[in-house]
Amino acid sequence: MYVLGLMSGTSADGVDAVLVDFRGNLNKPRWKLLNSVSLKYSVDLQKAIIDAGQGSKLSGCDWLELSEAITEAHFSAASRCDPDGISTVVGCHGQTVCHRPPKPSFRGASWQLIQAPLLATLLGKNVIYDFRSKDLALGGQGAPLAPFLDYALIGRGKTWRGVLNLGGIANLSLIPPLKGPHRKCHLLGWDCGPANTLIDLAVQKITNGQMNFDCDGLMASKGKPDLDAIKKWLKEDFFQQPPPKSTGREYFGSLDLAKRFSEINSANVNDLVATITCFTACVVAQDLNNLFKKSWIKPAELFVAGGGSRNIFLMKEITNRSPGIRVLSTEKIGIPSQSREAMAFALLAWWNINQKPINTNVTGLKEPSVLGIAVRP
């Protein structure tokens, strides 16, 4: 079955679209990536999305116009990715503007802006969307969902395999080995903490909006990280919390960045970016080290995807802080680093059409469930 997958992540920089052919066993499908397209949001649309996610007061009409603009961008990306219209169904994540993980005192919830009926009508295809709500309603974190793609498409090997996504948020998947004492272990996955969310905000603030991100990590490479500040940050509650856990821009946004800037013992702009970038690497390394201490689980390979995989400074920091782990791009296994999450929602749409439930181990939902809501054109 030809499936379109559409994803716009926490960085809110645009829409990634993929066209994938899935066939065979639902648990271990044969697959082929036929096309991929990345469409950038306009500067104004990106700013509107980020402001909305950080508490900007909007009227009902403002929300309506924002969701329409996001839907039109998704339609454009889908049309470019599948110009001949060969796809049968579309898996669309939408644009997250609020993700609230569950706590003992309140129910979890997540809101992705997209007008799915409009998108289905424009494309003339069934659209599967709202993948997180059912998971949250059943007590799960609602995120991350991409680990299910890693398990199905990358698969198991002789040792534990890790997949790290460096989008707006850094999240990990750990795939158990085929043999050995850990062969009966479950797939693991969780959000580690901020990645491009804080790094991009830092660059935008320092350059007064003249730059949107640190290309290749050049600014960070010229600076010196404040390791004392990072050591303090790693003791915060979220980073001490065991999986399953999830987070978003609501926690790691402009206010959080301002607080961290005030705690860095340097006013040098390159030092500021280096510290925020190194913080992401330390968050990931701490999670991997804690897991090894508690469960003797350590991946031999760590495949990295997302925009952060192109940040040379960040990749070096992760490699240096993860001894004994081979760090490489998902490109090495045929999954473009920018396409992984869009492929995940294509897979979830295919599973929805075939009524395949996901398991409970990654997000913590109480029972297996089919994720997503279907809308016809």
UniProtKB/Swiss-Prot annotation:
Classify the source by domain of life.
Bacteria
Name of this protein = Anhydro-N-acetylmuramic acid kinase
Family as reported in the entry's similarity comment: Belongs to the anhydro-N-acetylmuramic acid kinase family.
Keywords recorded for this protein, A-Z: ATP-binding, Carbohydrate metabolism, Kinase, Nucleotide-binding, Transferase
Q: Where does ATP bind?
A: G9, T10, S11, A12, D13, G14, V15, D16
* Coiled-coil ranges from the UniProt annotation: none
**Catalysed reactions, as listed in the record:** 1,6-anhydro-N-acetyl-beta-muramate + ATP + H2O = N-acetyl-D-muramate 6-phosphate + ADP + H(+)
Q: Where are the transmembrane segments?
A: none
According to its UniProt record, in which pathway does this protein act?
Answer: Amino-sugar metabolism; 1,6-anhydro-N-acetylmuramate degradation; Cell wall biogenesis; peptidoglycan recycling
Q: What does this protein do?
A: Catalyzes the specific phosphorylation of 1,6-anhydro-N-acetylmuramic acid (anhMurNAc) with the simultaneous cleavage of the 1,6-anhydro ring, generating MurNAc-6-P. Is required for the utilization of anhMurNAc either imported from the medium or derived from its own cell wall murein, and thus plays a role in cell wall recycling.
Q: Under which EC number(s) is this enzyme classified? A: 2.7.1.170
Which terms does the UniProt entry file under GO BP?
1,6-anhydro-N-acetyl-beta-muramic acid catabolic process; amino sugar metabolic process; peptidoglycan turnover
SUPFAM superfamilies, alphabetized = Actin-like ATPase domain
Which Pfam families does this entry report, sorted A to Z?
A: AnmK
Q: What is the enzyme's class at the highest EC level?
A: transferase
